[in-house]
UniProtKB/Swiss-Prot annotation:
Annotated compartments: Secreted
Protein name according to UniProt: EGF-like repeat and discoidin I-like domain-containing protein 3
Free-text note on domains in this protein's UniProt record: EGF2 and EGF3 form a rigid rod via an interdomain calcium ion binding site, while the long linker between EGF1 and EGF2 lends considerable flexibility to EGF1.
Gene this protein is translated from: Edil3
Tissue expression pattern: Expressed in angioblasts and early endothelial cells. By embryonic day 13.5, also expressed in a restricted group of non-endothelial cells including chondrocytes and retinal neurons.
Glycan attachment positions: 73, 88, 140
């Protein structure tokens, strides 16, 4: 038997098996019947590799060996289970190359080693994207994402405009502690003028001069993930005015408020504001805010507290970023339509489908159908099946004539031939989405449940003037 153990030691070293413990744990050897002691395991001080015919924690149990014609008995190298961390022991007649007994351990996700004794460090594979910080856990990992990203691997971007500038957020959703009145009350700098890049003589919100604790508030109408804010000043009577610094508060009911604080402290965060009246300045929230109401409290102002702004973020579920109509990521050839209108029947005034991009500028800046009927459609080919969670629509003007789609349906397909119309789950019929009421304001609709498809069609159902459309699709390219 001594010669057999010595031979095992020699062969084991040449094959690269785990080294035997040299400390007090394995010296003297606690394994009986020629068992080999292994130390350095995750959840036990040592483990015994038992020779054929023996089993148990110390190789003290005799195994009943079956003949070639018989099926193995219930006793064997897998009783008791030598595998750690929930590993499954399987009897193996094949020579495995790293041990001398007839079994292998099938390890659960997150563990490896001969006996599943090692916790895998998943962070070594760098699963967290977009600057996320990985923390290794037992058989798992977690990603701490920057404010503008979310998802298990920080794979979803969450920094789109929430609609102050575009008009998705209505006037009624923007309120303030006070309003400045000038020129004997003829000029009123209302809170709903606080829209980023707003033009005109009165183009921002200004707090009243006697307002000692001014604030402006946005009601998002539902709980959303807010990851940042863009601020901008304005000129009033030729004089630059802007907010140099501010604080942020948030609430879910509009009554109980919490101040945004420096991460890991009880100190209220003071955000840097603007340095002139026109240049936008952005701040991100890490961690992000999850709330329905957001308030901005000016701290230091130049002359008067004057503001234009936009909130950034996404729906709580994420996956609500623009898919590329406005940015051009969706290319011209991917956008097609049922028909096209030409003003004065001139090619230079052709309202092609490729022009149906949100906020497109120019004299011919949208898609207009050649016919005004409910058989018209605008189609976007996303090239691969994509999760679509929302849509933004906008009208346009044709030589001063206001035109827009007042309502529409959505259809989707994966092959471009067989189509399904998105259904209203409660009423069990085709969903009719509310469209626009003018030529310029953005109108956003959430698609719930989301559509998962390659092709999307907008089916105009009612319209003003001619069927005219600019649009953006919202969603994400993957679902992990």
């Amino acid at each position: 038997m001594k010669h057999l153990v010595a031979a095992w030691l020699l062969v084991g070293l040449s094959l690269g098996v785990p080294q035997f413990g040299k400390g007090d744990i394995c010296n003297p050897n606690p394994c009986e019947n020629g068992g080999i002691c292994l130390s350095g395991l995750a959840d036990d001080s040592f483990s015994c590799e038992c020779p054929e015919g023996f089993a148990g924690p110390n190789c003290s149990s005799v195994v009943e060996v079956a003949s070639d014609e018989e099926k193995p008995t219930s006793a064997g190298p897998c009783i008791p289970n030598p595998c750690h961390n929930g590993g499954t022991c399987e009897i193996s007649e094949a020579y495995r190359g790293d041990t001398f007994i007839g079994y292998v351990c099938k390890c659960p996700r997150g563990f490896n080693g001969i006996h599943c004794q090692h916790n895998i460090n998943e962070c070594e594979a760098e699963p967290c994207r977009n600057g996320g910080i990985c923390t290794d856990l037992v058989a798992n990992y977690s990603c701490e994402c920057p404010g503008e990203f979310m998802g298990r691997n920080c794979q979803y971007k969450c920094s789109g405009p929430l609609g102050i500038e575009g008009g998705i957020i209505s006037n009624q959703q923007i309120t303030a502690s006070s309003t400045h009145r000038a020129l004997f009350g003829l000029q009123k700098w209302y809170p709903y003028y606080a829209r980023l890049n707003k033009k005109g003589l009165i183009n921002a919100w200004t707090a009243a001069e006697n307002d000692r604790w001014p604030w402006i508030q946005i009601n998002l109408q539902r709980k959303m993930r807010v990851t940042g804010v863009i601020t901008q000043g304005a000129k009033r009577i030729g004089s630059p005015e802007y907010i140099k610094s501010y604080k942020i508060a948030y609430s879910n009911d509009g009554k109980t408020w919490a101040m945004y604080k420096v991460k890991g402290t009880n100190e209220e965060m003071v955000f840097r504001g603007n340095v002139d009246n026109n240049t936008p300045y952005a701040n991100s929230f890490t961690p992000p805010i999850k709330a329905q109401y957001v308030r901005l409290y000016p701290q230091i102002c130049r002359r008067h507290c004057t503001l234009r702004m936009e909130l950034l973020g996404c729906e709580l579920s994420g996956c609500s970023e623009p898919l590329g109509m406005k940015s051009g990521h969706i290319q011209d050839y991917q956008i097609t339509a049922s028909s096209v209108f030409r003003t004065l029947n001139m090619d230079m005034f052709t309202w092609e489908p490729r022009k149906a991009r949100l906020d497109k500028q120019g004299k011919v800046n949208a898609w207009t159908s050649g016919h005004n009927d409910q058989s018209q459609w605008l189609q976007v080919d996303l090239l691969v099946p994509t999760k679509v969670t929302g849509i933004i629509t906008q009208g346009a003007k044709d030589f001063g004539h206001v035109q827009f789609v007042g309502s529409y349906k959505l259809a989707y397909s994966n092959d471009g031939e067989h189509w399904m119309v998105h259904q209203d789950e409660k009423q069990r019929k085709d969903k009719v989405f509310q469209g626009n009421f003018d030529n310029d304001t953005h109108r956003k609709n959430v698609i719930d449940p989301p559509i998962y498809a390659r092709f999307i069609r907008i089916l105009p159902w009612s319209w003003y003037g001619r069927i005219t459309l600019r649009s953006e699709l919202l969603g994400c390219a993957e679902e992990e």
